């Protein structure tokens, strides 16, 4: 594991510890996983890969809709609530936030979690990620994905 990837995973882990989020990951806008929090087992990694692909598809469709309204705007964030409100323990939310043009932060958490806290901590994590990447822009992890800035 590269040093940068390890630092990214630490940021994702801290997001979970600070918020009660069940999963946090960095993904590309093509649906590829860059980094996932370290508390994942093999089954969770497969679920995250599927969520990453689905999130990329949702993002792409939403961006097309935004382009129809105003072609000069870029989608910044999507929040998806899932569940029937019959069993709040199983209802969940997916929050997808753009970090760079091709890198997204995907967070999955119980619907009953404080969304304001999630937004606050996610924004802190995004700032940390951007600072890390600026410090180590030559790292292969991001160079393979393309230009970030």
Q: Which stretches of residues belong to each language-model region?
A:
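Acidic, low-complexity cytosolic segments
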Residues: 1-23, 33-149
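Short, acidic, Ser/Thr-enriched surface-loop or helix-capping motifs
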Residues: 28
């Amino acid at each position: 594991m590269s040093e940068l990837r390890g630092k990214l995973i630490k940021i994702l882990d801290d997001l979970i510890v600070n918020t009660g989020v069940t999963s946090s990951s960095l993904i590309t806008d093509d649906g590829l996983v860059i980094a996932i929090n370290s508390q994942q087992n093999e089954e969770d990694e497969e679920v995250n890969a599927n969520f990453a692909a689905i999130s990329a598809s949702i993002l792409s469709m939403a961006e097309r809709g935004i382009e129809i309204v105003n072609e000069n705007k870029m989608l910044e964030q999507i929040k998806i609530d899932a569940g029937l409100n019959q069993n709040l323990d199983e209802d969940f939310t997916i929050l997808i936030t753009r970090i760079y043009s091709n890198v997204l932060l995907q967070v999955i958490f119980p619907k009953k979690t404080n969304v304001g806290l999630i937004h606050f901590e996610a924004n802190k994590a995004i700032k940390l990620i951007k600072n890390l990447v600026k410090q180590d822009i030559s790292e292969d992890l991001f160079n393979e994905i393309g230009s970030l800035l």
